[in-house]
Amino acid sequence: HLEQEGCRTRVTVVPPGFDFQELYVDSRNSLPPSVLSWLASRRGCPVIAQVGMLRPEKGHEFMLNLLFHLKMNGRQFCWLIVGSGSPELREHLQYQIDSMGMHDDVFIADNVFPAAPVYRVASLVVLPSENESFGMVLAEASAFSVPVVATQIGGIPEVIQNNQTGTLLPAGNKHAWMCALNDFFNDPGRFYQMARLAKQDIEERFDINKTVLKILTLAKHK
C-alpha cells in the first residue's frame, strides 16, 4: 500500500517497549479496598480480569453474555472489570449485570492506576475487543504469566501467538469463546503453560531497552 502511494523508503516497524522492572514494582501496590473486599467475598473463585476503557468496541456486553451462560452451566468465577468510561455506558452495563442476576459475580472497579496489581490476582485476562491496535494489556498480563484469551484482530497477533503463548479467537464468535473458556476451566494447566512461554517471549521482544536501542540504531543509519 505504501509503495502504491509512492513511498519507496524502507519502513521498519519498532514495537512499543515496556519497563518490566517498573511494572513489577507497581504490582506491589495495593488494590482499592472495594476490590479487595469483593475478592475476599469471592475467595476460591477464578478471577477473570478485563482491563480497558468502557467502550462499546471493547466487548463487555459480549463477555457478560458468555459468562452468564457459563454460570447457568454451573461454572463459578468472578469477573473483575477494570477501566473507566462514560457514566451512561457504565450505568447501562451495571443494569445488565443486575438484570441477569450477576451482581455477585461481576465487579466494575472503574479506573485502577497502576493496573499492575490486577495481574497479581487474575487467573485469566480476556480481551474480547472488536477493534484493537496493539493490545498492551495482553503484554502486561503475559509479563506476570497470566493466561490470556483475546480476539484475533488488529495488532493483537503481533503480541500473542495463537495456541503458543495464548488463545486468539474470532471477534464475536460466541461458540469459539464458550469453548475456549470451558477449556480453561477444564484444563487450566495448559493455559498456564502457554502463559509461562508468553512471559519469556514478551520480555524478550518488548523490553524497553531493546526498543530504545533499535530506534537509536535506525536513527544512526538514517
Locate the predicted segments by residue:
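Nucleotide-activated donor-binding/catalytic signature segment of Leloir-type glycosyltransferases, i.e.
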Residues: H92-D110
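Aromatic "clamp/platform" in nucleotide-sugar-dependent glycosyltransferases that forms part
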Residues: N111, E130
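A short, active-site helix/loop in glycosyltransferases that binds the activated sugar's phosphate group
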Residues: H1-V13, F18-E22
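A conserved mid-protein helix/loop that constitutes part of the nucleotide-sugar donor-binding site
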Residues: P46, Q50-H69, E91-H92, T167, ...
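A short, well-ordered alpha-helix in the C-terminal region of glycosyltransferases
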Residues: P46, A176, D183, R190-R205, ...
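A short helix/loop element that forms part of the nucleotide-sugar donor recognition site in Leloir-type
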Residues: Y24-S41
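Short hydrophobic beta-strand element within catalytic cores of glycosyltransferases
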Residues: P147-A150, I160
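Conserved acidic donor-binding segment of nucleotide-sugar-dependent glycosyltransferases
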Residues: N162-N163, T167-K174, D183-G189
